[in-house]
A protein has these predicted regions:
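Short hydrophobic "strand-cap" motifs at the C-terminus of beta-strands
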Residues: 33, 235, 256-259
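Alpha/beta-hydrolase fold catalytic core
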Residues: 1-29, 52-55, 280
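Conserved HGGG/HGGXW glycine-rich cap/lid loop of the alpha/beta-hydrolase fold
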Residues: 20-69
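Catalytic histidine-centered segment of alpha/beta-hydrolase-like enzymes
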Residues: 259-268, 272
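Flexible "cap/lid" subdomain of the alpha/beta-hydrolase fold that forms the substrate-access gate
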Residues: 2-6, 14-17, 41-42, 58, ...
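Residues that form or immediately flank small-molecule/cofactor binding pockets and catalytic motifs
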Residues: 24, 239, 258
């Protein structure tokens, strides 16, 4: 059984941040960002493997996911998430070796930070969502892109669903369970959904969490449109039913066999091995 993580809080100007941490206190830092609808516990299988290699893995709960607070500024845009990731580098004791690792919304944030020339992180790893610009077609890839885009709307219905005020938060946990089943077919998410119920205990938290999608229509999306300028590893499950694997391959992602969207939980050894190889 993997060792239990250390749990503690740090403070940002807009909210408190709950953090789970694995590994040696003096190890180089990996800040690991979870996605939607998920929690920092999503790293419980990969983090111990990175910790065994000497890394200190700190996994914050994102805005609106308890024990982190609901931000006083109400911000849930990519720009706000990038600001949090940059601030956490210093708050968590990062240095010039620090790595930013993200899944889903954590990957969107990681990709945006990798597009910032002033990123405080030396390397960046994104799981299950490549940079948005990297998924644009070229004349050479137009056919593959078109085939993937025909299928993608079948997976992306939830984005429009989350735009409707009051709808997604009314029965958030039923929506979450459906998405886990759809995105990672065959994976047993019982433990993950239990963690999610603790992290999203009421309608106010649910409203904050789905507001990430509502903020996509505002100016705060801009950082996510930047091309990466720092070293960036992309990993994507071959059975992902959230974002078409074909789009990820066009972006240069390495395919992880036997995994859906929650690749870090379904194939932790493969993910950890790829990350450690990239970091070496």
């Amino acid at each position: 059984m993997s060792p239990a993580p250390r749990a503690y809080d740090v403070s940002l100007p807009t909210h408190a941040v709950g953090v789970l941490e694995w590994g040696p206190a003096d190890g180089p830092l990996v800040v690991a960002l979870h996605g939607f609808p998920d929690t920092a516990q999503t790293w419980r299988r990969v983090a111990p493997l990175l910790a065994d290699a000497g890394w200190r893995v700190a996994a914050p709960y994102l805005r609106g996911y308890a024990p982190s607070g609901i931000p006083t500024d109400g911000g849930c845009s990519v720009r706000a998430l990038v600001a949090d990731a940059r601030a956490l580098h210093g708050l968590l004791g990062g240095d010039g070796r620090a790595v930013l690792l993200g899944h889903d919304w954590g990957a969107i944030t990681t990709n945006a930070v990798a597009g910032d020339p002033a990123s405080p992180y030396a390397r960046h790893v994104a799981l299950s969502v490549p940079p948005f610009p990297a998924m644009n077609p070229s004349p050479r890839t137009l056919g593959t892109w078109a085939g993937a885009m025909v299928r993608q709307p079948l997976h992306s219905w939830y984005i429009a669903f989350n735009q409707v005020p009051g709808l997604a938060e009314r029965d958030f946990h039923r929506l979450a369970a459906r998405l886990w089943r759809q995105w990672s077919p065959g994976y047993d998410a019982t433990e993950d959904l239990a963690h999610l119920r603790d992290a999203v205990p009421d309608r106010e938290h649910a409203r904050t969490v789905v507001s990430y999608y509502r903020a996509l229509l505002g100016p705060g999306i801009t950082p996510a449109l930047a091309e990466p300028v720092h070293p960036l590893l992309l990993l994507h499950g071959d059975r992902d039913r959230c974002l078409e694997p074909g789009l990820a391959r066009l972006a240069g992602a390495t395919t992880v066999g036997g995994a859906g969207h929650f690749v870090q939980l379904e194939q932790p050894e493969k993910v950890a091995a790829s990350v450690l190889s990239f970091l070496s």
